[in-house]
Amino acid sequence: MSTPLRGSSPQVSFYESELDQEGGSDASHFTYRNYMEDDKINSFTFNMARKDQTQLFQRIILTNESESEIEEYAEVAEQLLDAINLREKYVFHPKIWKADAPVGEKPPYSPFESDESTNCATEHMFKEVNGVYFVYSNETDMKSNKALFSVPHTLASYYKDINNLMMLSSYGPAKTFTFKRLQLLESKFNMHTLLNDSLELFQQKTAPHRDFYNVRKVDTHVHHSSSMNQKHLLKFIKRKLKENPNEIVIFRDDKYLTLAEVFKSLNLDVDELSVDTLDVHADNNTFHRFDKFNLKYNPCGQSRLREIFLKTDNLIKGKYLAEISKEVFTDLESSKYQCAEYRLSIYGRKMSEWDTLASWIVDNDLFSTKVRWLIQVPRLYDVYRETSTTTFQDFLNNVFHPLFEVTKDPSSHPKLHLFLQQVVGIDCVDDESKFEKKFTEKFPVPGEWSSEHNPPYTYYLYYLYANLYTLNQFREEKGLNILTLRPHSGEAGEVDHMGAAFYLAHGINHGINLRKTPVLQYLYYLTQIGIAMSPLSNNSLFLTYNRNPFPAFFARGLNVSISTDDPLQFHYTKEPLMEEYSIATQVWRLSVCDICEIARNSVLQSGFEHNVKSHWLGPDYANSGGNDIKKTNISDIRVCFRNETLIEELHLILKSLQTLPNFKNLNINFLLDKLPSEITTGNDYKLKKAQLKLNGANKLRNSSVGSTPNNGTPSSSGTPSLSSPGAIVHLMKTKPYIPPPLSLNIKQENNNNNNNNNNNNNNNNNNNTNTNTNSNSTTTNQDDNSKSDK
């Protein structure tokens, strides 16, 4: 049906849908009213802006889906569900940390004061077994190997799961199914914006004192040593040369050098310094050359300047980096609505790195309500092997042993205990384009890995994940905050990097290689894994801006945000995050609602505390479809569209699974938790959900679930009416679309339903009567399309 929103005719026709509940949730039905008058359209538009009403807008609803296609892709749906269920078993599901804290912008802790309730030492013991740390209640339990916590999967089973996932990603029917669904998702979004952009903009204008500039946005992926822009660094260096030229800053060539002597030895004059001589900005020579890009961290091409100005562990104990960090914090706080999650490095060369880094944070009072920290672990075991780490286990010990030690007894590392209050996650970084040995379950355990070759990405990620898993359980038991795994993944290299991250990570950075594998991309969509993308960074290193998949990912509904990565190398302005947003908006023609949605995604992906997110996004931010337009400036229509589209995709998976003969033995817990109760209100699904919660059994009776026919009254057979042959897409102004409850053999049941109705209406039933009834039904559908839309 065409909907002439503009034109010479003053009349606009659309459908408004109301959901009435009669006889309980199992007897829900729809009634439609067709408005053709201008005055009623105005009142409808006014109602659209009311927060207390269900959102009404033009929806795209597909009808007459082919049952043969649903059956054809049932096997694919089962494999997709298996992958999702495996992720649910792998990934650590944290409890909401201090959820009872009052809603506010400040975190529920004092940054440099420890909580007495979590500051006491306990009798817990821990030890490393085959590369993974395990925690025990006491020494007796440790001797008898009675660990408190365990890791869900071993290295061997992990690699088998990765292999299966890679086989699924190259499976023909799976690629066809997921590619079609992703294309349909993108087309749906384009149609939605075409039909409803003016309504979304109208809703945004009704939000008082709110626009894109004053909604919270988090830079979820930025490296701290390059958090300032090149002009800022240049001014800071010049200022230090003028104010403190005689300060001793480095020990080189068996003598101590002052700042002025360092520049003199490099033949650099303060008056001749410029952005060009600083030479820290990425250029054409860095494209596909990560080695040359790493050299850009050296101001003027000199490693000693990097050590003086951009390192925390140096002769002056990171004094200059702390000072410039405070200036960056001041810029963030002056902007008020911009926040950042900075990466600090732990290399795994020695255990004292943690205490050194924590002392730098605490001694310099580096804290801001706008900043949280992540620890990045570079994959450089092969570099340090000859000096400090003889096996990969030494590397893991240097990274994790201090964390378990401070969790057991905070007084053993008091500054580290305070610093960890502000740390929200672990990152894994390095050049993904390097060649690496293919993964196999026959890899040696870390204690036996003494090879000169670096372990592959998947090996690193598993042992970071496994040790974080037991550490988080330990910290959660003691009432401490937990650390999530959010690695770099999919910037370059093989697609198995993103497969490993799908199972193990809470979110990823970059992810541009998802464009190469529709199966993984669809899985990331269904599970809504956060993806922090950096288009300007990719443009200088691996992928030109016009080829970046960000706009496609966003349109399809993936949980994507925009981040800066390295402002020192890629940006020019004092507000690099706003620079990213402005370029993306202009190049990809994003609307105000689009960029506000991206900003909201960045807050959801971030590690800021629950009470802080509630203050920024509203108390319902964690609920499905929850939105407070007064805080997010996102139209309720947009949030409703995203939520309904995801529900429809999950519902399609469930419908496909229902055609399988072993459906009653499948674990559909994930789908039952994500889908609204209106879809799973039938007795069969109530029974199955109850049994899943009680004993894990999956039982489903082979009977259809009650539904609603088009005439607004409950059907005697409990099946939906499909009396609209040929109809493919209907544009409707409706309340949220709720797919009908599932039923088996819909076509056959529908025919039986029509025959039963004919028998009830006419005792002298014959073939002519049936023909007339079908003809009348078709005529009725032509007169009132509202009866064929469901």
Curated annotation (Swiss-Prot):
Its cofactor is Zn(2+). Residues 706-726, 750-781 have a biased composition (Low complexity). One of its GO terms (molecular function) is AMP deaminase activity. Activated by ATP, inhibited by GTP, EDTA and inorganic phosphate. It holds the Pfam family AMP_deaminase. Binds 1 zinc ion per subunit. Residues 1-14 have a biased composition (Polar residues). Substrate binds at residues 223, 292-297, 491, 566-569. Disruption phenotype: Cells grow normally until development occurs. Then they make a significantly increased proportion of prestalk cells, and develop fruiting bodies with short thick stalks and glassy sori with less than 5% normal spores. They have an increased content of pstA-type prestalk cells. Intracellular levels of inosine increase dramatically during development. This is cell autonomous, as the presence of equal numbers of wild-type cells does not alter the cell type proportion nor improve sporulation. Overexpression of the gene has no apparent effect on development. The active site is at 510 (proton acceptor). It is found in: Cytoplasm. Its EC number is 3.5.4.6. Keywords: Cytoplasm, Developmental protein, Differentiation, Hydrolase, Metal-binding, Nucleotide metabolism, Sporulation, Zinc. GO terms for cellular component: cytoplasm; cytosol. InterPro entries: A/AMP_deam_AS (IPR006650), AMPD (IPR006329), Metal_Hydrolase (IPR032466). Pathway: Purine metabolism; IMP biosynthesis via salvage pathway; IMP from AMP: step 1/1. It catalyses: AMP + H2O + H(+) = IMP + NH4(+). Residues 1-26, 698-726, 739-790 are annotated as: Disordered. It comes from the Eukaryota. One of its GO terms (biological process) is IMP salvage. It is an enzyme of class 3 (hydrolase). Belongs to the metallo-dependent hydrolases superfamily. Adenosine and AMP deaminases family. Catalyzes the conversion of adenosine monophosphate (AMP) to inosine monophosphate (IMP) and ammonia (NH4(+)). Participates in the regulation of the adenylated nucleotide pool and the interconversion to guanylated nucleotides during early morphodifferentiation. Homodimer. This is AMP deaminase. The lineage of its organism: Eukaryota, Amoebozoa, Evosea, Eumycetozoa, Dictyostelia.
